[in-house]
């Protein structure tokens, strides 16, 4: 870097021409200021190319997902519920009422429902009867369980329970129900329901319970008779149904005599006849397979000839 030199004039003591020369070591203050200014300019130039002072890159706008604005259009309109949604809102009672109404208006649909619906199970049928039984108990006034006042208060609920007993009993009888064990399971459960029917003080009101005993006794007799024809009498003995029937007859006060007679005649009930307290007949044929199984004689050698 070149430095500005300051010219100085020296005069000799003697008179003569003036001599001028330049002092290389003396610097003018003006020259010093100029050099500082150039240095500052150079620094500014250096800073202009520095990354810190470089112009910022243009920022890229952030793309945000645009919100779909739902505008009112023809899709927003009043319309009824679809069939699946409508069925979700119905209670069991409402659904049964609607289905029953449709079946009554269209007998062909009713027939298809009857043939397509699964058969009720014993547990399901007894559970429904328990529901009717609970309604009967809820309608009974406190402190008047067997009076005439209570009878007229629960007459409607009593009739509904008796109708349900009759309808379900027919469902579990042969030939609709081919399995003897299932028929006997239902009869055992429904007989317990009949035992719990009110014993009205007025004799004229007791015909409901007496009629129920007559019907269920006939049902027991039918199942036992059909079981003996198919060789199912052995199930009655081995399953303990004969003993249960005897207890039911005792609890009813001897009102299930028809079933007891069928048990004694068709199957061969072993023990005392609960009606006459005499030994019950062992069946029509003492040499039947059932009696041989009971007596332990089945499979024993059979003698042939006079000896």
Swiss-Prot record:
Residues 1-10 have a biased composition (Basic residues). The keyword Transport applies. Residues 1-63 are annotated as: Disordered. Residues 15-34 have a biased composition (Polar residues). The keyword Transmembrane helix does not apply. Binds the proteasome. Involved in ubiquitin-mediated protein degradation. Regulatory factor in the ubiquitin/proteasome pathway that controls the turnover of proteasome substrates. Targets proteasomes to the nucleus and facilitates the degradation of nuclear proteins. This is Tethering factor for nuclear proteasome STS1. It comes from Podospora anserina (strain S / ATCC MYA-4624 / DSM 980 / FGSC 10383) (Pleurage anserina).
């Amino acid at each position: 870097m070149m430095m500005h030199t300051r010219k100085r004039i020296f005069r000799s003591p003697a008179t003569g021409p003036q001599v001028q020369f330049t002092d290389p070591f003396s610097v003018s203050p003006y020259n010093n200021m100029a050099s500082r200014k150039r240095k500052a300019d150079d620094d500014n130039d250096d800073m202009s190319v520095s990354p810190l002072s470089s112009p910022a890159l243009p920022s890229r706008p952030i793309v945000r997902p645009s919100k779909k604005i739902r505008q009112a259009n023809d899709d927003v309109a009043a319309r009824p519920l679809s069939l699946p949604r409508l069925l979700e809102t119905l209670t069991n009672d409402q659904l049964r009422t609607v289905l029953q109404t449709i079946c009554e208006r269209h007998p062909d649909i009713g027939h298809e429902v009857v043939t397509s619906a699964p058969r009720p199970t014993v547990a399901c049928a007894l559970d429904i009867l328990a529901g009717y039984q609970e309604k009967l108990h809820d309608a009974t006034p406190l402190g008047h369980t067997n009076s005439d006042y209570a009878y007229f208060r629960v007459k409607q609920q009593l009739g509904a329970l008796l109708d349900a007993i009759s309808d379900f009993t027919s469902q579990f009888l042969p030939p609709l129900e081919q399995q003897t064990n299932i028929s006997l399971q239902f009869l055992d459960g429904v007989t317990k329901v009949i035992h719990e029917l009110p014993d009205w003080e007025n004799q004229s009101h007791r015909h409901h319970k007496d009629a129920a005993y007559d019907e269920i006794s006939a049902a027991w007799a039918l199942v036992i008779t059909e079981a003996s024809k198919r060789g199912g009498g052995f199930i009655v003995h081995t399953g303990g149904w004969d003993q249960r029937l005897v207890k039911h007859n005792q609890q009813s006060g001897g009102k299930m005599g028809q079933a007891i007679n069928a048990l004694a005649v068709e199957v061969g009930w072993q023990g005392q006849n609960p009606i006459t307290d005499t030994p019950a007949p062992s069946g029509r044929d003492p040499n039947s397979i059932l009696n041989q199984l009971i007596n332990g004689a089945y499979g024993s050698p059979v003698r042939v000839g006079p000896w």
